[in-house]
Amino acid sequence: MTKYVVNNSTIDSILGWIKAGEIAIPEIQRPFVWDSSRVRDLMDSLYKGYPIGYIITWKNPDTKLKDGTVSLGKKIVIDGQQRITAMTAALLGEEVIDSDYKKKRIKISFNPKEERFEVLNPAIEKDTEWIDDISKLFKHGFNMFGFVNEYCALNGIEDTN
């Protein structure tokens, strides 16, 4: 009898689990300890298609979670909490609880011309070549066509249809 199964899952699948509340962090996991530059580096690795390591989950119906509830059959994160939390922060725009137990919003920016990620700062915020917060690209109802047209207009890029 198999004790475990290895699945290859896409980032889209993992984000779907997070949005649907199907994945949870157990009470025993530590707070989020990555700094913003490490989150930026993870986004860069994902963009370039580099492997980011395993994320190990376990289905257990009665594991106590960080929010005080019980897992009720959700996927419990055993290894990969920092990476999942980083993706949740950068791609879904959710706040994280840092090592001082304070809520913090991490905004990662992207420059399509240079294909480069950075942590949002005041200079980037004013520069139209940068997408100031990549999480807006993943919001429900996001209008990609309108966004691309606006980006091109702001940056003097002609429509190449």
Task: Explain the meaning of each model-derived region.
Residues 2-161:
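Basic- and aromatic-enriched surface patches that contact anionic nucleotides/nucleic acids
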